């Protein structure tokens, strides 16, 4: 399962579920019901078509196909014309340390509903990873680099943690724009606020800018330009409006 990649792919294919923010719109749950019929708790809520994505991808990976090639093939099959690049073809697993030990991210986030206090975050395998083909070049040759308002610690953090990618983003000739996921001192969803605080950062746009460090410290007193815009996006119209506002602000 590659949750962030799948969300991007489903969104660009026009099949994403707008109510949940993940999965496929109108998906059914016969597989989950079948699992429950055997007395097993189907706590990881994946729809039938979403299961198909994971089954096909797992099969192709077991056949030796690299993740980047698998994603390109699957995105193409869904009619997505844009390139979707994973950060790496290597296996990297997000691990969360809580009071009773280390958990896989989905065990923490979904299984325990991210209720535990996060003591640490680690990315198992990150030190052995290499950027997937085309990722560094995409950063270095881009006209504009957006770091979207995902969780800085567990969504953007592992991408920048792949050896060479933080440097590539910092060396990009294009402007680098970091969008803060913090609104009014809190995250709109998920555990981003608590994770920022655990890492010693202020839960604010300033704290997000501080976390991204040399990439685009977007607070005036850090020496870079700050743009204040409406970042709460409830539907497609809001997203189009926000993208247009950012482009207009950048000139």
Where are these regions (language model features)?
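Electropositive, gly/pro-rich neighborhoods at or near active sites that engage anionic ligands
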Residues: 1-123
